[in-house]
Amino acid sequence: MPAHVMIIAGETSGDALGADLMQALRRRQSDVMVTGIGGPKMSGEGLASIFPMSEIALMGLKEILPRLPQLFKRVDEAVEHALATEPDVMVLIDSPEFNHRVAKRVKAKRPEAKIICYVAPHVW
């Protein structure tokens, strides 16, 4: 049975890192299954994103506040996907506000879940 990796990338730099990670995983195990959330680069590597990454790639209160209900809905969808598909490992790239909410809720329901924070955001 192929390994199942769920990757969540919430911004452009994370999408590029996620695509690189997908390539590296496939070099090691060609039949690895990758699900999750990503942008065009990860889609180019074969990811069918749960929803468009652009819906969580928001910066600053001015962008975030009016979209809070939608963001909470997207957290719910990511958690539901993780619980329904039971990936072998979840890899979270950037977007800590979103990703940590997902991770906390998944761990509450599946304490044995393996979750890796692949890259933390950088200060520019």
Where are these regions (language model features)?
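Active-site and donor-binding regions of nucleotide-sugar-utilizing enzymes
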Residues: A3-W124
